[in-house]
Regions:
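Acidic, glycine-anchored loop motifs typical of Ca2+
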Residues: 236-240
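Bacterial lipoprotein signal-peptidase II cleavage site
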Residues: 20-27
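Aromatic (Trp/Tyr) and acidic
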Residues: 22, 55-130, 152, 156-215, ...
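N-terminal low-complexity, Pro/Thr/Ser-rich intrinsically disordered segments
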Residues: 30-50
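Bacterial N-terminal signal peptides that target proteins for export
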Residues: 1-7
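Carboxylate/His-rich catalytic cores and anion/metal-binding grooves
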Residues: 242-263
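C-terminal motif of bacterial Sec signal peptides marking the signal peptidase cleavage site
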Residues: 16-18
Length: 521
């Protein structure tokens, strides 16, 4: 089975004709308590961070892919050598290209192409003056393990169950937050909101954040289903359902607990307080936040999307999810306000998902009213992107002119990203001041969607170049991906790891699913 292309045949013909330039208990049982020293010495030695002059993807390169190293320094040599790390033999000698002085970074930069090296192995690069690079691999399955590890991060973050070493390894832990929580606005009411994924080290769980992350994971599966298997190494593996859907279903089960069964209202989230003193007069440390319109719309978006994709595996469960999404939508309508501009994006995305899954005209009416607005679409908003992709991919009746408007926005954004990447030192928009990768990941989300529609080789190359950037071919010479590379992001900041960021990891999964699919074509 090949990837499920978004079918907009008439639209693509129109567009492509003109785009020749587009190349718990109160005290949880089983929790681990960590104690530190009573006093921490104030040691603040300034240790300079050393960055190599030869920058590579520290994980490695696919056998037949383009392989480029970036060189930087006060002076540039003429040639470089690729060394077999095991034997010490020189296996390739190349010449530096496109030497130039970078005024912004105050350094010389150059590039070395060693794409003809296709023998599997572990290597590093040496060059006079600049020294050596970190080591890297060449092989056909270089990205397989980080793809699985990125997906497994959500399993590691499961709340309410025991994670055994068989599946979680060093991330194993006892069941946590298994008791009931108190409703923050009325502490006489207790609720079972166990389960789901921890979103940070405190164990917080926010419905809108969860819905957005779930939707990106589901989009990955929708666009590239063949990239996902049923043997990822979680307890549900082997049940006939792709593990990515099993994992999202675990979060869906928690989301359903967050909905009031009588009214359809959706509580905004679960807050874990570090001390009882945070809320005067209250004794528990787990609280359910009050229901909100944003949470209800986000809930409706995620569960409708899940329902649509899960119906082929369990139609009854999918139908129940769709009904829950509809109830949340209707409850939100009762409490929305005219000044709720920020929440309109959630309403749009929820309506798009509900229209595709259920086909009701009321959903379509709102989606098309939103798309017809004069102010246009916010091309930098992830939730709006999710709604747009669903509208142009639905089998329900749509307006061609609105699909054209969406595609024009997507393709314009894709070309802007491409232009920036072409002129970037590291073939991305990354630079010396890069303190997080959220914008780059969002850019790749846009590019991945557009590439799925038109299959542009340049876009595929740019997506892979961003993966090279995240894996060490960047100005800091660090890998932002856990368990990949010699020089981890932890050397400059423990919060920068992509897999350790709840929402960022889902976008990494989307990138890797596209790359895995492109390698099969």
């Amino acid at each position: 089975m090949r990837k499920q292309k978004i079918m907009i045949v008439p639209l693509c013909v129109i567009l492509l004709a003109g785009c020749g330039q587009i190349p718990s208990e109160n005290i949880q049982s089983g929790e681990n308590n960590f104690n530190s020293m009573e006093e921490t010495p104030d040691l603040s030695y300034e240790v300079p961070v050393s960055t190599p002059g030869i920058l590579v993807n520290q994980l490695g390169y696919m056998t037949e892919s383009t392989k480029i190293a970036v060189f930087k320094g006060e002076e540039m040599p003429e040639e470089f050598h690729v060394i077999d790390a095991e034997s010490g033999d020189t296996v390739y000698t190349g010449f530096l290209e496109d030497k130039g002085y970078n005024q912004e970074l105050s350094e010389y930069n150059s590039y070395g192409d060693f794409s003809s090296l296709q023998t599997p192995g572990i290597y590093y690069i040496e060059a006079p003056v600049l020294g050596r690079s970190y080591s890297f691999s060449v092989g056909d399955q270089v990205y397989d393990e980080i793809f699985s590890e990125a997906c497994r991060q959500y399993y590691y973050n499961r709340c309410g169950i025991t994670l055994t070493t068989e599946y979680a390894g060093e991330n194993a832990h006892n069941a946590c937050h298994t008791g009931k929580a108190l409703l923050k606005e009325d502490t006489s009411i207790s609720l079972d909101v166990s389960g789901g994924w921890h979103q940070d080290e405190k164990g917080q769980k926010n419905v809108a954040v969860a819905a957005q992350t779930m939707s990106v994971m589901l989009l990955s599966y929708e666009l590239y289903p063949d990239s996902f298997t049923d043997d990822m190494g979680i307890p549900e593996s082997g049940n006939g359902v792709p593990d990515i859907l099993d994992e999202v279903k675990y979060e869906v089960e928690w989301m359903l607990k967050m909905q009031d069964q009588k009214t359809g209202a959706v509580y905004a989230g679960v807050t874990i307080y570090s001390s009882n003193g945070d809320i005067p007069g209250k004794t528990a440390d787990i609280y359910v936040e009050p229901a909100s319109v944003e949470a209800e719309r986000a809930f409706a978006m995620a569960l409708a999307k899940f329902s649509y994709l899960y119906q082929n595996f369990d139609n009854e469960y999918a139908t129940n999810c769709l009904k829950a999404a509809d109830r949340a939508w209707k409850h939100a309508l009762l409490y929305e306000t005219d000044k709720d501009d920020k929440g309109e994006k959630w309403k749009f995305a929820a309506a798009a998902e509900l229209y595709r899954a259920a086909g009701q005209g009321s959903y379509r009416k709102y989606v098309e009213e939103y798309l017809n607005r004069e102010e246009g679409l916010d091309e930098q908003d992830e939730v709006i992107l999710l709604g747009c992709v669903t509208y142009i991919s639905t089998k329900q009746t749509v307006k061609l002119e609105l699909c054209e408007k969406i595609m024009e926005m997507l393709m314009t954004r894709a070309e802007e990203i491409s232009d920036t990447a072409r002129s970037g030192i590291y073939f991305t928009a990354g630079n010396k001041e890069q303190n997080n990768n959220n914008q780059l990941l969002l850019d790749m989300m846009y590019l991945t969607v557009v590439n799925h529609v038109i299959t542009n080789h340049e876009y595929e190359t740019i997506i892979e170049n961003h993966l090279h950037y995240f894996l060490g071919r960047n100005d800091k010479g660090v890998s932002y991906v856990d368990k990949a590379g010699e020089n981890s992001y932890e050397s400059i900041g423990s919060s920068l790891g992509i897999m350790k960021q709840f929402d960022a990891d889902s976008k990494l999964i989307l990138m890797l699913s596209e790359i895995a699919d492109s390698l099969e074509r």
